[in-house]
Every structure is written in structure tokens, then in C-alpha cells.
Amino acid sequence: MFLKSKLYQAQQFAKYYRRAKTRYNIQTPFVFNFIENVLENDRNYYGFSIIEALRHSLLKENKSIELIDFGAGSQTTKTKFRRVNQIANSALSSDFQCRWLFNVVNEYKPKHILELGTSLGISTLYLNAASDNETKLFTLEGDPKIAHIARMNWQNAHHLLMQYTLANYDGVTDDLEKHIENDILKSAPEIRLIEGDFEKTLTTTLNLLKTVDLAFIDGNHRYDATMKYFHQILSYTKAHSILIFDDIYWSKDMTRAWNEIKNHASVTCSIDLFWCGIVFFNTDILKVQHVTLIRAKLKPFKFGWSF
């Protein structure tokens, strides 16, 4: 099963690469803006190093925990007991992917964010770092032990940010430390983590959010579940909403789900980045667009064919 799935992904990547366009092949203003300000944006923010330090510590953590898997499971192991570093290595979005999520939030300024699949909380921290204190950020995690680790990571991130900020001051007093901590707390939204099976928690969370400006869906890689999440969230979207589906080439089922989602009547633009798919509902886009993109440095040569 593992080799079969990896072969499928390799075949799909070859097709993706051949059809993918770079910033030099796009003229549509909406998509070009996405490329310049999101996909090709390599600006570094001080918070990134703090979050990546947490990722590094997770990759060294050998403690084992027993998991409850509500999703499609892992393609690397089927055991219920897994080490934290195994989870970090296989389940966390990469450094680049997380920075990309940060860019999405930073560019489009969503005020109601939903994440399906908290995992160890690293991607959540990037979403949080790009948000202001008026943003509502809800993240759903099925496994209580993983949720506990995520909460601990968020606390550690807060402490590291405090240390980083205080290091820039001479003669730190208790009052100054308290003032800085209050500023940090006010600058980013509270992360609301909801534990439990998405079948039970998604509806409740959507009712609390009332609208979804941005959703990052990375919790279940089955066709039926993905389509159900899409239709549930769709009822809470507006013209400015953005939905991101992770691992669209994880399996034939996920690719099937992605193809149906991007061709839904309400979608005005879809972008395929291979590792994820993004759909927009922007009514200012008069002609439906389906675009496959890749960073220019990853495709310096232009192929003369596609399929």
C-alpha cells in the first residue's frame, strides 16, 4: 500500500510539473498578485525562527503516545503508538508550507479562520502570527494527546517570544516585562482548540464562527469526509472566502475530491500547488480560472508539452 501510494504521488507530480506555470506565464491580475505576494514571497519574519525552534525540538522528542486516528491514517506506519518525532516528521506541514500559510493570512487578512487538523500546532502558530487580535482562529484536533502537545507548544512559543523581546531591552523591570507581555497578548488572537471527532465538532465550530474567511483542511484524507467538510464549510463562505485543501494528490480519492471541489459552481478560481489546492469564490473574477502554479526557481526551463 505504501509503495503503491508513493508511486501514484510520483506519477501525479510528473504531470503537475509539466503543466505548472510560473510567474512569467501568468497575466491575470488576481492570480499574478497571488504569485507575487503569497507564492513567491520569501520575506522573513522574526516569529518564524521561534516557531521553527519548536519544530526542531519536536523532531528530537522520542516520547511515545497512543493515538486515536479519525482520519485516513499515516502512509508510513499503522501502529497506534507513535513517537512524537515520528508525528512531527510525517504530519506537520513543512517550513515552506507554513510560511506560505502565513503569507496567505498576511495578504488576504481573513478575520474568521478555521483549521481542520491541528496536529502538533506548528501550522496554527503561523496562522496566528499573521493575524491580528480581532481575528477568530479555531483549530480542530481529533486526538486529545496530540491536542495537549499543541497547547504546550503554544505556551512555549509565548515564552520564547517574551525572551526574544526582552533580550532587546537593557535593565528589564517587572513593570516592563508585564507591559511587553500584555502587548504580545493583544497583538495576536486567542487560539481556540476544539477536541474530538470532526463529525461532531465541525458543525458546532462553524456555528461559533458564523462565517469562514479562510479554512485550511488537513484532517482527513478520505473522499467522503473531504467532500462533506467542503459542503459544510461552503454554507459559511462569502465572496472573499478562501479554502485550502492539503494533500490533494495523497491518493486517487483525494484527487477525485479536489477535482470535484474546484469544478463546483460557486468556485471562480482554483490554484493547484501540488501539495495543496486553493479555491476562491471572488465574484469579481468574471471568467472561471483553474491554474497550476510552481515557484519560478523550481522550473527554470519551459516544457513544450502538457497533459
Language-model features and meaning:
Residues 1-214, 221-242, 249-307:
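A short alpha-helical cap/connector motif
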